[in-house]
Amino acid sequence: MAKEIKFSDSARNLLFEGVRQLHDAVKVTMGPRGRNVLIQKSYGAPSITKDGVSVAKEIELSCPVANMGAQLVKEVASKTADAAGDGTTTATVLAYSIFKEGLRNITAGANPIEVKRGMDKAAEAIINELKKASKKVGGKEEITQVATISANSDHNIGKLIADAMEKVGKDGVITVEEAKGIEDELDVVEGMQFDRGYLSPYFVTNAEKMTAQLDNAYILLTDKKISSMKDILPLLEKTMKEGKPLLIIAEDIEGEALTTLVVNKLRGVLNIAAVKAPGFGDRRKEMLKDIAILTGGQVISEELGLSLENAEVEFLGKAGRIVIDKDNTTIVDGKGHSHDVKDRVAQIKTQIASTTSDYDKEKLQERLAKLSGGVAVIKVGAASEVEMKEKKDRVDDALSATKAAVEEGIVIGGGAALIRAAQKVHLNLHDDEKVGYEIIMRAIKAPLAQIAINAGYDGGVVVNEVEKHEGHFGFNASNGKYVDMFKEGIIDPLKVERIALQNAVSVSSLLLTTEATVHEIKEEKAAPAMPDMGGMGGMGGMGGMM
């Protein structure tokens, strides 16, 4: 297919048009008074959202060059959401403002490479000032405030997230699911839970709930398949002398071994239960090791030179309580050493940082949460499917932003943090580097101005008023008052502000230093040929009707 090439200003102007259209659609969602955007779906009801990244993801433009510009900024919004959970609209507004200011200067003759260098230096200096101004998240109240703001000022969601984080800790897994009713709920699973239930319903100890509960139990962990009773008989005899219940976690237990265990359980000879090991392949081995560390046991594996026949009681893990239903096993109060658990947690965190696969990262985070003390499930309720999707998106965003706040700390919100940080930056740059520096200094006012405009105020007037002051002074767009932002609980995670600025500068630099674009020429489809009318020849005979 033939390609068309656009050069210099004509290329950049078309790219800018795409960025402008994306920005204009996304900017209306910004701030506590942001508006909704209605999005047509290929099937079903349209979706309604106030989430910037959801709007950005839907945008495809007909002009191929403009669309390239829009797609680049869309990627920035997505990356900001992935890394920080929030700040997508901030990143989009910043990228547009930087590109707009930069394009004006480059069209006037500034050197794009020098301008880029100045922009990078200014952004780095502002981020350093943001870090100095940040403070650690102190307690549940501040976590609630961050979550509430990220959930578009929904205090109920903010409180649910704060409760969940309080119960499972900052490394715990918090998942979001759809509730069956219209009420929001929080469900917390203490201890380590994995998705394997009992191998036989005859292991049940509570017939009403159909669960098996073992108190102060031993845990046998092995990556072997147990099919013969003689494999585990010596160990069973040793545990019987101790008078404690036993949970067997193995690759599988089948045939004679399972039958014998069930019969002895029913006769009251053994207080025992058996489940399959969680996971598959190498992940199964790692999860068995996790359980071993949590319970102070040892995985009996031939790879380690250990066999079931010669296993000692010292190899068994211990737990205060184990609850098993048909789908899940929960181990509470594992008796492993806390320093061993901490070492394992640190090891998994290192693996999370180094992996590039989203799937592997998700599975590692699940393992981390199981070791760190639990899983919380936020169940989101809504009256309709459209409302459910919109609310679920908000909860996901708020959750990620809250984790970002706990990780790196918080700064004043409402777009004021960037202005405060910029006030403390004074770089001695020259020529076109200085132009790049000044572009950033003007562009960082855009988020605050847009928040004010969406709330019905004059953006320029609000920015000027905030610039006259120092410290935590900012603009509360909810009521139009100038307040101490920390005292009012109007705060943003540092990570959100940092990543939004870094990503915006990165994409703007790429766009400003673009000198040519290449795109396919759309072929005009020929009009379909007229259908063959040959079959109508007989109409000639109609002359006889005259």
Curated annotation (Swiss-Prot):
One function term, GO molecular function aspect: unfolded protein binding
**Biological process per Gene Ontology, one example term:** protein refolding
Q: According to the UniProt entry, what is the EC number of this protein?
A: 5.6.1.7
The entry's stated outcome for residue 293 to V is: In strain: 85P
- Keyword field contains Aminoacyl-tRNA synthetase: no
Question: Impact of mutating residue 76 to D?
Answer: In strain: 85P
Any idea which UniProt keywords this protein has?
A: ATP-binding, Chaperone, Cytoplasm, Isomerase, Nucleotide-binding, Stress response
UniProt KW Chaperone keyword: yes
Which chemical reaction does it catalyze?
A: ATP + H2O + a folded polypeptide = ADP + phosphate + an unfolded polypeptide
By its UniProt entry, which SUPFAM superfamilies does this protein fall under?
Answer: GroEL apical domain-like, GroEL equatorial domain-like
Where's it found, cell-wise? Cytoplasm
Outcome of residue 123 to P?
In strain: 85P
InterPro entries linked? Chaperonin_Cpn60_CS, Cpn60/GroEL, Cpn60/GroEL/TCP-1, GroEL-like_apical_dom_sf, GROEL-like_equatorial_sf, TCP-1-like_intermed_sf
Top EC class of this enzyme? isomerase
Q: Mind telling me which Gene3D superfamilies this protein's record contains?
A: GroEL, GroEL-like equatorial domain, TCP-1-like chaperonin intermediate domain
Task: Tell me which GO cellular component terms the UniProt record holds.
Answer: GroEL-GroES complex
Pfam families assigned to the protein according to its UniProt record, in alphabetical order: Cpn60_TCP1
Indicate which residues the UniProt annotation says bind ATP: 29-32, 50, 86-90, 414, 492
Q: Please give the subunit comment from the record.
A: Forms a cylinder of 14 subunits composed of two heptameric rings stacked back-to-back. Interacts with the co-chaperonin GroES.
The record's annotation in PANTHER family points to: 60 KDA HEAT SHOCK PROTEIN, MITOCHONDRIAL
> What role does it play?
Together with its co-chaperonin GroES, plays an essential role in assisting protein folding. The GroEL-GroES system forms a nano-cage that allows encapsulation of the non-native substrate proteins and provides a physical environment optimized to promote and accelerate protein folding.
- Family designation: Belongs to the chaperonin (HSP60) family.
Record's protein name = Chaperonin GroEL
Q: Identify the taxonomic lineage of the organism of origin.
A: Bacteria, Pseudomonadati, Campylobacterota, Epsilonproteobacteria, Campylobacterales
